[in-house]
Amino acid sequence: MTQAAAPAAHSSFYMAMRILPATRREAMFALYGFCRAVDDIADERGPATASQRLAELDRWRADVAGMFAGRAPTRLAALDQARRDFDLKQKDLDAVIDGMAMDAAEDIRAPDWATLDLYCDRVASAVGRLSVRIFGLAPEPGDALAHHLGRALQLTNILRDIDEDAAAGRLYLPREALAAAGVT
């Protein structure tokens, strides 16, 4: 198992990623490792305070910028190879960090639809845009697939995790939908 594969080994995605051709597989392992690392910062496994979590996400943002400037830090070596092999976009990696920052800054409670859509784009559709490049889809249909599938999967996750999120002080259901259902 490669170093990039290690974080994915305990994921439900691991077996699916293993069947990809080697270059695509290593790129997906690297992308998964990046997403897992920044997600861990934003949730309960991350630093204790919001300011500490945001500072750590800023370090990741600086490392991503350095990678695109030709100065990839060691922790992004595998992702840098994926970036070069598959033309991954900095804006999508930054969007993932921005989504985690939305979680890290404060507990999300009943955002409006626009904020929820932005959150879904950042934490799910951006990952989809990176993934479809690795899978080799053409940009236009690939980005459309990432847009819709990312949102569908993230909304499904929100519904699946509603109890867990509530225990953590988070509520991702949009306030307009709650109001329409008579929930205040």
Residue map of PLM features:
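Acidic catalytic motifs of isoprenoid enzymes
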Residues: 1-184
